[in-house]
């Protein structure tokens, strides 16, 4: 059973419920795909996905994990008006890419992005998006 949330133990008698890694990535991709309909730029999500893909590369590269990410993306995208982008090349829509990278340099004022080129970040997250098992989508 794929869980959307996980419990994180903070102390012996305290824990918090938070999104699973797979759910976070699915939500971040949904947010990027939804930029056009919401007219919002999501540069932070590009960085967040890039960071998570870098930190958890081995785990996120597993076929079963990619399937979970795609299933969660499909589920969290229901009724969001982004069906036209829920396919392998959906992330390459020029307007989505433009909005994703809009004012990206201002992100450096908020967090240390280690001078990583935004285009390289977008390429990395696009490649992961391509690698999801889209042939399973009906």
Which residue ranges define each predicted feature?
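Structured mid-to-C-terminal alpha-helical surface segments
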Residues: 1-138
